[in-house]
């Protein structure tokens, strides 16, 4: 996996959850914060990552 932030600049509006990758193979955090597992160093710590399967609907927000 790689950071999709470049592909989806408005990922926070396109995805249902904001996925924060603190490190590789991190475990999911409680609450609405979901951590994407297997993120590479390309994301950088604290970078927002998201897979298309985590997106709520199409790549473009319906609103």
Curated annotation (Swiss-Prot):
Tissue expression from the record: Expressed by the venom gland.
GO molecular function: toxin activity
Keyword tags: Disulfide bond, Neurotoxin, Postsynaptic neurotoxin, Secreted, Toxin
Cell location: Secreted
Family of this protein: Belongs to the three-finger toxin family. Short-chain subfamily. Orphan group XVIII sub-subfamily.
Further facts: In contrast to other snake toxins the action of this toxin is reversible. Unusual amino acid sequence distinctly different from other short-chain type toxins.
Name listed for the protein in its UniProt record: Short neurotoxin 2
